[in-house]
């Protein structure tokens, strides 16, 4: 019986405690409502005073009262008050205050799409193109709006073009140490055309991981970016076609083999052609067919592909994807050789990380996405796959660059145009000048 009374007593005490807490919570709500109501009244008093000042066109004083109302009181009316303050700034021509408020709203994530557009246009007028691009980039991430997108696309592809005096050059790798020929020998230049390694080589590859292969007095030699020798060929190779990572492709008597970058044979297997790739896989040709091999030269696929599309880096793969051909046409594959989509195209260019340049049976070029869907119709004489959101296209005999909406972003008056690599591309102008085109806002495309 005593135990039963104890249990009942505990239950009663628990109920009392709960009732006390409920009453306290109710009182807290009442107090908060009273305080909030007081805040709303005080806030409204400031706004009424501001309206009186506006009748006399004393906008800056009205602005200050609105700011005080926003800063000192946090009520449900604050979002509306802030938008009304924008109207006051615009009506009173308080330009600096207007854009400061928009900037604050953008940072807080409360700005509307038109505010992003207005602020970006203001930044462009002030000559701050980079900040305008950043503003539009933030807006693009939040809104699907044609006006914002059109403005963003119109400014994000700002570029500089620098002439280099050498016309016989090779496409560099991502480091942009450019192999160039002075008419007699090969050397290396940077993007401004300055010589970084003298013209002393009979042949020269691009650099990969700070190494390149050059030919000196008939012997292939591994050099660093400082020009120092690190290895020499003892295989009497006839040609070195590529270097990538720790491997090179050497040719002897018309047969291709893979060597270490110190010219040690990695296999005694001969191929008809070989492409190395940054992702480590090897694409090799034997008996007229292509296969994908691992970095250990083990077959990932059989020799089943009729052709492979090579990109401007001289590689078949970009990341984990490539374009290959079978008897029905070109299509996309992943690094394990499995198809990415079912669509087959009459022709295709190597993948560069964006839209893929593909052709129809008539030889007209357009663009496919990664699902095999045509997103830019077949209409061009030639094209290169997209990189950095731009695709080089040939139209009416001249090259230019289009964006994903098929708008010409870099005028089509070029004799030739390469893919963008690390934000830069090599072009030839209609006057025959070789130039390096550099995107001003490369970080936007990363």
Positions of PLM-derived features:
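N-terminal Lys/Arg-rich, disordered targeting/topogenic segments
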Residues: 1-14
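Residue-level detector of conserved, function-critical positions
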Residues: 40-67, 78-446
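Hydrophobic single-pass membrane-insertion segments
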Residues: 31-43
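Hydrophobic membrane-insertion alpha-helices, especially the h-region
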Residues: 16-34
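Helix-centric, low-specificity signal for extended rod-like, repetitive segments
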Residues: 6-9, 20, 98
């Amino acid at each position: 019986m005593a135990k039963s009374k104890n249990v009942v007593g505990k239950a009663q005490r628990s109920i009392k405690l709960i009732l006390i807490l409920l009453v306290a919570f109710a009182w807290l709500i009442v107090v908060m409502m009273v305080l909030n109501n007081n805040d709303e009244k005080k806030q409204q008093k400031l706004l009424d005073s501001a309206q009186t000042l506006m009748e006399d066109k004393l906008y800056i004083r009205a602005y200050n009262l609105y700011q005080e109302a926003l800063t000192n009181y946090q009520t449900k009316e604050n979002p509306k008050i802030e938008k009304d303050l924008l109207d006051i700034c615009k009506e009173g021509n308080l330009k600096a205050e207007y854009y400061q408020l928009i900037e604050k709203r953008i940072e807080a994530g409360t700005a509307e799409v038109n505010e992003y557009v207005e602020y970006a246009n203001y930044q462009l007028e002030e000559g701050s193109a980079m900040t305008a691009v950043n503003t539009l980039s933030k807006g693009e991430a939040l809104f699907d709006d044609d006006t914002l997108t059109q403005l963003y696309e119109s400014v994000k592809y700002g570029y500089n073009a620098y002439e280099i005096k050498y016309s016989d050059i090779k496409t560099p790798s991502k480091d942009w140490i450019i192999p160039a020929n002075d008419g007699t020998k090969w050397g290396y230049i940077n993007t401004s055309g300055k010589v970084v390694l003298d013209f002393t080589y009979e042949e020269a590859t691009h650099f990969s991981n700070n190494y390149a292969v050059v030919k000196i007095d008939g012997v292939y030699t591994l050099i660093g970016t400082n020009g120092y020798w690190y290895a020499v060929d003892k295989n009497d190779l006839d040609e070195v076609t590529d270097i990538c990572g720790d491997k090179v492709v050497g040719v002897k008597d018309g047969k291709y083999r893979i060597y270490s970058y110190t010219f040690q044979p990695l296999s005694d297997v001969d191929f008809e052609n070989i492409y190395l790739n940054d992702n480590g896989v090897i694409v090799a040709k034997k008996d007229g067919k292509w296969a994908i091999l691992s970095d250990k030269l083990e077959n990932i696929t059989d020799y089943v592909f009729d052709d492979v599309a090579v990109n401007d880096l001289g590689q078949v793969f970009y990341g984990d994807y490539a374009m290959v051909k079978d008897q029905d046409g070109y299509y996309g594959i992943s690094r394990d050789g499995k198809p990415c989509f079912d669509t087959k195209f009459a022709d295709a260019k190597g993948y560069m990380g964006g839209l893929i340049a593909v052709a129809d049976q008539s030889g007209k070029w357009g663009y496919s996405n990664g699902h095999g869907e045509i997103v830019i119709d077949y209409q061009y004489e030639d094209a290169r796959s997209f990189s950095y959101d731009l695709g080089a296209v040939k139209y009416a005999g001249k090259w230019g660059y289009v964006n994903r909406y098929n708008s010409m972003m870099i005028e089509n008056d070029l004799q030739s145009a390469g893919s963008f690599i690390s934000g830069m591309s090599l072009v030839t102008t209609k006057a025959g000048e070789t130039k390096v085109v550099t995107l001003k806002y490369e970080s936007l495309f990363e």
